[in-house]
Amino acid sequence: MIKVKSPGRVNLIGEHTDYTYGYVMPMAINLYTKIEAEKHGEVILYSEHFGEERKFSLNDLRKENSWIDYVKGIFWVLKESDYEVGGIKGRVSGNLPLGAGLSSSASFEVGILETLDKLYNLKLDSLSKVLLAKKAENEFVGVPCGILDQFAVVFGREGNVIFLDTHTLDYEYIPFPKDVSILVFYTGVRRELASSEYAERKHIAEESLKILGKGSSKEVREGELSKLPPLHRKFFGYIVRENARVLEVRDALKEGNVEEVGKILTTAHWDLAKNYEVSCKELDFFVERALKLGAYGARLTGAGFGGSAIALVDKEDAETIGEEILREYLKRFPWKARHFIVEPSDGVGI
């Protein structure tokens, strides 16, 4: 029996840039998917969250449109890549909320991959884990995500954010201020629109790159956007500005300038809301209230359309600010919201 802890992730800055090979700045966080498992002839897993057991044989990898597809996807991708593994029997638990924009799917997939790697001695290196988990989500589960989530879950390092160029996969660890916490606010709004709207934005972004003849959004300057049709210009303009903001946050963090980091995050949120059109009134409410209560900055994190937002706050004030916003939020909105105080943490491991 082995026990694996696979973290969720928060993206500090660089939202909706990874599918055009731009810059991102995620971190693994101290909320986890936990998997306890042993070798077995089949796959038998009990999910605490769903309160049910699912099982399948290794020669039946048909999709079931349930949480077990994330597991099947990992077995499928290993088979596709000529790795030989047997089954597992075990239990999935943890404190990482599902559907909250904190990459529970990537956390789960990478956790299953790590479990199989250790049980069957696959000797996978870190980048292979990232690429295999991404392929499983893209090609088996059918979610057209970029590389950000899996990279953060695998490469996370305690006390650091990751500055990642998703084009070259060059990365750099940047220390996060020790006296600052990240307040994560889950709005309770399920992201029903996210899959179709996300796919539309990804399609428009990819078309924009083709029109401009570029391999990455990093190569595009604001002056070139006039070559694009109006909606493409609006959406892709956001991506170009967001790439620049990631570089600005990198520099501000290195200088220890938390105030500047906060301002950039807030600017990013309103650009996401007004020009990329992926916010909602609940996310905007959190950002406005967090700033009024003393946050350095705040923005939605993840795909948007609900899910979660983050605020940078002094560690000593984090819980108070979180409780106050939650109290006001619950008076105004009918959703079951929650808040978490998180810190940059290590990636997947035993």
UniProtKB/Swiss-Prot annotation:
Domain of life: Archaea
Keywords, sorted A to Z: ATP-binding, Carbohydrate metabolism, Cytoplasm, Galactose metabolism, Kinase, Magnesium, Metal-binding, Nucleotide-binding, Transferase
Transmembrane segment boundaries: none
Pathway assignment: Carbohydrate metabolism; galactose metabolism
Site (Transition state stabilizer): residue numbering on this chain: R9
Compartment list: Cytoplasm
GO molecular function: ATP binding; galactokinase activity; magnesium ion binding
Catalytic reactions on record: alpha-D-galactose + ATP = alpha-D-galactose 1-phosphate + ADP + H(+)
Amino-acid positions noted as binding substrate in the UniProt annotation, renumbered to this chain: E15, H16, T17, D18, Y198
Record InterPro entries: Galactokinase, Galactokinase_bac, Galactokinase_CS, GalKase_N, GHMP_kinase_C_dom, GHMP_kinase_C_sf, GHMP_kinase_N_dom, GHMP_knse_ATP-bd_CS
GO biological-process terms attached to the record: galactose metabolic process
GO CC terms in record: cytosol
UniProt-listed Enzyme Commission number(s): 2.7.1.6
Keyword Cytoplasm: yes
Root EC class: transferase
Keyword Kinase among UniProt keywords: yes
Active site positions, chain numbering: D149 (proton acceptor)
Residues noted as binding Mg(2+) in the record, renumbered to the chain: S105, E137
NCBIfam families linked: gal_kin, PRK03817.1
Biological function: Catalyzes the transfer of the gamma-phosphate of ATP to D-galactose to form alpha-D-galactose-1-phosphate (Gal-1-P).
Family that this chain belongs to: Belongs to the GHMP kinase family. GalK subfamily.
Protein name, entry field: Galactokinase
Organism, as annotated: Pyrococcus horikoshii (strain ATCC 700860 / DSM 12428 / JCM 9974 / NBRC 100139 / OT-3)
